[in-house]
């Protein structure tokens, strides 16, 4: 039994050693092959690289290529047809093959036309300068490889080396030149086709999933994945900056939507939202269906976070969505944010502050008392204050959530918090929003009127500042549109949303 166990151990150890030896052999062979290739083709590659750098420095890269191609074609015809090569016979493959590669190199000089076609799709030469440099490097390297191929028979004659061996060496150099030229041509063609495909897809497809589309492009074109992604990002960014495309980061990744198509679809949906005062999540989902052709996960996430025609409000019966068209028919507890429908008579002045319960009123009063209490007095009574606050855990928790996240949305807590910050900075600041003047400023800081909107997303924070009926910006001061204050983490999205509104003429200039 012990002998069997010992034999198994030796067998396993032997296999492990053989595996290590095989890996070492493969690594050694790879390194040796790489060294041989470097010795064979490295000088030609280095010469091509140096030539490209020098001609680029003097801005004669294309012109030098033209002269080199003409000279190469003349020499190739002299070798192939007139038999001027000492070691090559005329009208044979060995002498005629150079005509083929030189003609192919001449075709590569059409690169300015290729670049012009690429530019028509939105890519500039600066965007692909690295690829153009590599293209010319391949062009010049191919000529040096052809020169090595032509010199191989001469070396065999001069140094009495086996003609057969040098013939294979010359053929290897010529094949390397041919492959180099074909690879360069395929790369510039793939680049042109890629830019055309991206532009055409953006024109034809109103909705695209970024990740799946990029993966498809990387699989379809023989370009490095990093280059494909860079070209793709460049063209996408251009259209987003021009307002032709919108990007949404949703549950299953980023989605790209044609802006005009999106606006048409959402305009119709926002009109439907005006038909009822509020919608439950299921009612909203049924109404919206999948009008943007998103995946189910992305569609649900869009409804939850990205609708800019209204916002979610916490009613006593649950969370409901209300169009900004009906927002004046609501009243919101200044303490906990609870919302209810309030059909006030026309020209009725709303209450400066409304509380849904005596508990919320007591909480707000207590917070104000603590804020106004002198620091030393607050410290001395900290224990008592703590006991009082402990009596109101549920309401306090709700308030704290609203303070921290912006709550459902009009910035009652944000007005006061930012007001305190401005006062600490020695700015002349006061709160105006408590008088609830229609379309009035919330705060006045050093003579600047500021409207505060703290909703759950940037689109909703900005959307809450626009009229639900005509879509125009509601808050106009004596000096033009009032400044809009949103949460810090929504700033980038709010700027993009406001830029779109301005582009659509929704903000009046004075």
From Swiss-Prot:
Membrane-related topology note: Multi-pass membrane protein
Transmembrane segments: 2-22, 31-51, 62-82, 95-115, 137-157, 165-185
Superkingdom classification of source: Bacteria
Keywords: Cell inner membrane, Cell membrane, Membrane, Transmembrane, Transmembrane helix
Topological domains annotated Periplasmic: 23-30, 83-94, 158-164
Cytoplasmic side: 1, 52-61, 116-136, 186-510
Designated name of the protein: Inner membrane protein YeeR
């Amino acid at each position: 039994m012990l002998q069997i166990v010992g034999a198994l151990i030796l067998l396993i150890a032997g296999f492990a050693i053989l595996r290590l030896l095989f890996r070492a052999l493969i690594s050694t062979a790879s390194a040796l092959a790489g060294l041989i290739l470097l010795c064979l083709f490295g000088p030609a590659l280095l010469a091509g690289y140096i030539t490209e750098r020098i001609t680029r420095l003097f801005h004669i890269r294309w012109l030098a290529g033209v002269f080199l191609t003409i000279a190469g074609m003349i020499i190739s015809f002299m070798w192939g047809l007139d038999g001027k090569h000492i070691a090559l016979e005329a009208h044979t493959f060995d002498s005629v093959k150079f005509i083929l590669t030189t003609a192919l190199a001449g075709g590569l000089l059409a690169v300015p036309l290729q670049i012009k076609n690429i530019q028509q799709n939105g890519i500039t030469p600066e965007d692909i300068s690295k690829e153009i440099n590599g293209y010319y490097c391949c062009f010049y390297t191919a000529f040096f490889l052809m020169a090595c191929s032509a010199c191989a028979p001469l070396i065999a004659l001069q140094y009495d080396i086996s003609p057969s061996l040098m013939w294979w060496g010359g053929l290897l150099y010529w094949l390397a030149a041919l492959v180099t030229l074909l690879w360069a041509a395929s790369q510039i063609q793939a680049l042109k086709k890629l830019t055309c495909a991206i532009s055409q897809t953006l024109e034809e497809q109103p909705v695209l999933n970024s990740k799946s589309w990029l993966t498809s492009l990387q699989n379809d074109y023989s370009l490095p994945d990093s280059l494909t992604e860079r070209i793709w990002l460049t063209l996408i960014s251009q259209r987003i900056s021009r307002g032709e495309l919108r990007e949404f980061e949703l549950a299953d990744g980023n989605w790209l939507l044609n802006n005009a198509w999106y606006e048409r679809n959402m305009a119709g949906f926002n009109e439907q939202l005006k038909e009822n005062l509020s919608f439950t999540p299921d009612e909203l989902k049924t109404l919206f269906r999948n009008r943007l052709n998103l995946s189910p996960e992305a569609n649900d996430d869009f409804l939850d976070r990205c609708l800019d025609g209204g916002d979610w409000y916490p009613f006593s019966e649950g969370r409901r969505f209300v169009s900004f068209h009906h927002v004046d028919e609501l009243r919101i507890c200044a303490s906990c944010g609870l919302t209810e429908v309030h059909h006030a008579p026309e020209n009725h002045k709303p209450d400066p502050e409304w509380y849904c319960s005596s508990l919320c009123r007591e909480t707000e009063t207590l917070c104000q008392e603590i804020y106004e209490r002198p620091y030393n007095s607050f410290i001395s009574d900290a224990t008592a204050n703590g006991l009082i606050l402990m009596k109101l855990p549920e309401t306090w928790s709700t308030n704290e959530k609203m303070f921290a996240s912006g709550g459902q949305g009009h910035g009652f807590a944000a007005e006061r918090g930012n007001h305190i910050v401005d006062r600490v900075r020695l700015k002349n600041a006061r709160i105006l929003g408590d008088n609830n003047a229609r379309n009035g400023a919330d705060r006045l800081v050093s003579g600047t009127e500021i409207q505060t909107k703290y909703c759950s997303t940037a689109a909703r924070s900005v959307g809450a500042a626009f009229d639900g009926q005509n879509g125009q910006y509601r808050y106009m001061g004596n000096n033009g549109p009032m400044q809009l204050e949103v949460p810090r983490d929504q700033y980038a999205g709010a700027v993009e949303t406001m830029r779109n509104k301005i582009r659509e003429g929704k903000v009046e200039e004075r």
